[in-house]
């Protein structure tokens, strides 16, 4: 019986089974530049995506490039990637192709980012702090792979690893949500925490390295 229980626990770990945590009112803090600090977000369902919506909030005072959200599969880097190259310059990747959205550089911190993409038209729509930054064409007809490693805090240069400290995120991230469909972004509430793939109020995650959970400072 003891061997059976151990076997079941081992299979649960292999399958990525993690207890759900209600993160409402909390944030992940990445206190310093690092190549080892990150959080893996485990979706409720692993599936290929022909549409998706991603929303999250973040605070940082970095002036160098950094990753906000990194979604890789074993066969493709940058399946979904949110990356800031310069202040106010948001690089949004789907299937390792990129669209660049530019915002005013004097925006107040923190920022609320919402972006959606649909395969049939290839249209990516980007909103920042409740205001649209426009729509651009990106990888029309593509399907995002479903067997993914989803990481905040680092940019994956290989599946689940090969991190560069000079691209790491330093600051705070909270209210991350991912949906498997296009959500009209003008209707996404300020809380933006109820995605059907990643839900901040029922979050499956694994933290690694120097990551701290604290009550959030901002709404």
UniProtKB/Swiss-Prot annotation:
Keywords: Calcium, Disulfide bond, Glycoprotein, Metal-binding, Secreted, Signal. CDD domains: PTX. GO terms for molecular function: metal ion binding. Its cofactor is Ca(2+). Ca(2+) 1 binds at residues 77-78, 155-157. It is found in: Secreted. Transmembrane segments: none annotated. It comes from the Eukaryota. Expressed in colon. Residues 24-219 form the Pentraxin (PTX) domain. Glycans are attached at residue 51. Belongs to the pentraxin family. This is Mucosal pentraxin. It comes from Mus musculus (Mouse).
